[in-house]
């Protein structure tokens, strides 16, 4: 089964501001929903169900390949696009679920992913608001 899942939101910030937050998942991950991806080694991250390898993808702020499970083959990445209202942050998952993972993706992973990604976007907006509030206090 082919997988394609896209989330996007326009945030009133620069791509650089958002990229700095994306660089550290611990600061933006909704840990009340799921543990944040844990670094296993350089550019290798473990989640509760998957192992990701970070790689350089042209145009992406961060990009990952799914290394395991073998039945879930794909990539996911964050893109940042400057627009008049700020920046569009886009997260794309593209790949294929094989065998039992067709049902696991559809019934468990994708619904959880959707909730987690929207919460990540919420947390980015909250973190930016805190930064701006701190900047205001310094003036």
Residue locations for each model-derived region?
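Short, exposed beta-strand/loop patches in secreted or surface proteins that constitute
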Residues: 35-38, 50-57, 80
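Beta-strand/loop substructures that line and gate deep hydrophobic ligand-binding cavities in soluble
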Residues: 67-122, 126, 131-136
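A short, structured loop/turn motif at beta-sheet edges
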Residues: 12-16, 55-59, 79-90
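Hydrophobic pocket/interface hotspot
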Residues: 18-29, 53, 62-64, 89-91, ...
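Hydrophobic ligand-binding cavity/cleft-lining segments
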Residues: 1-41
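Short beta-strand segments that buttress and anchor functional surface loops
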Residues: 40-47, 62-69
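Short, surface-exposed coil-to-beta transition loops
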Residues: 4-6, 47-51, 72-77
């Amino acid at each position: 089964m082919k997988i394609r899942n896209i989330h996007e939101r326009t945030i009133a910030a620069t791509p650089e501001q958002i990229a700095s937050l994306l660089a550290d998942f611990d600061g933006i991950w909704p840990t009340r929903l799921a543990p944040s991806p844990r670094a296993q080694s350089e550019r290798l991250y473990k989640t509760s169900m998957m192992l990701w390898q970070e790689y350089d993808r042209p145009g992406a702020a961060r990009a990952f390949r799914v290394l395991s499970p073998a039945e879930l083959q794909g990539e996911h990445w964050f893109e940042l696009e400057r627009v008049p209202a700020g920046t569009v942050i886009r997260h794309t998952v593209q790949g294929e679920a094989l065998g039992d993972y067709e049902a696991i993706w559809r019934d468990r992973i994708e619904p959880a992913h959707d909730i987690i990604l929207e919460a990540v976007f919420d947390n980015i907006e909250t973190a930016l608001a805190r930064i701006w509030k701190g900047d205001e206090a310094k003036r």
